[in-house]
Amino acid sequence: MYTRIKNKVKQIGKKILGIEQPKEIISEESSGRVKSTVLAKRLLEYDVISFDIFDTLILRTLSKPTDVFMFVGEKLGILNYTTMRRDMEWKLRREKEAKIGSREVTFEEIYEEMEKYCGVDAQKGMEAEFQAELDFCIANPYMKEVFDLLKNYGKTIIIVSDMYFSKQWMEKLLSSCGYEGYDQLFISCEYGFGKRSGKLYQKISEEYLNGRSVIHVGDNPAVDVEMAQKQGWKAEFYQDIHTRGKKYRPSLMSACIGSAYRATVDIKMHSGA
């Protein structure tokens, strides 16, 4: 069942994105983005270019991050898995914040709780969820062009994300989407603090930048723009595709197919590629 649904979602995505057809050119005006070459030229002015991951370098072919959990639940044969998984993560975040003042959690910690309170085998759960991420994550075609242009110019590229996946997990995901050759990867759960508090930017400035100029590219106006600027970084806002496309997308569709449809249309029309 999981495989059938996954393949159906991919089939819809390929048709909408035109992967199996000659590529239609989406104009600068229709996508609302400057050309990738224009953005790359702006970023070339800085010594170090930093990228966010989800909704910036990588896009999910689903309209919400938690929609991945629907497919995990289907694969594991567990009803109401989405609610269970989402609630367990937030329970753990609240408990850690009350105990140590940090909301950062790891993938392994989440599934330790899932096993303890929900009876989900931690190893099987982690494998199923990460495989689902691999199945539904793709490179943002627009940002991939920008990334490759900068890399060809020999620029220093770092990747910075607030995420529960460890560096090892994220390296696999980035590689599966074609991102190789970046200089450093910083993940919040490995430090116990993230971009949201500004502390991860501060840490990178102190231990990695050594006074070099830096600009961060990301989709969250508070986390990727305001907090970066507060720490003395320049920032380039990339509005996420779902915010741009949401008002045009139908909502009266089944959860799985509707999520895939909305996501793939948003990628096609609003990524900038």
Residue ranges of predicted features:
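Active-site neighborhood of HAD-like aspartate-dependent phosphohydrolases
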Residues: 38-86
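Substrate-recognition/cap helix-loop segment adjacent to the acidic, metal-dependent catalytic center
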Residues: 151-158, 163-189
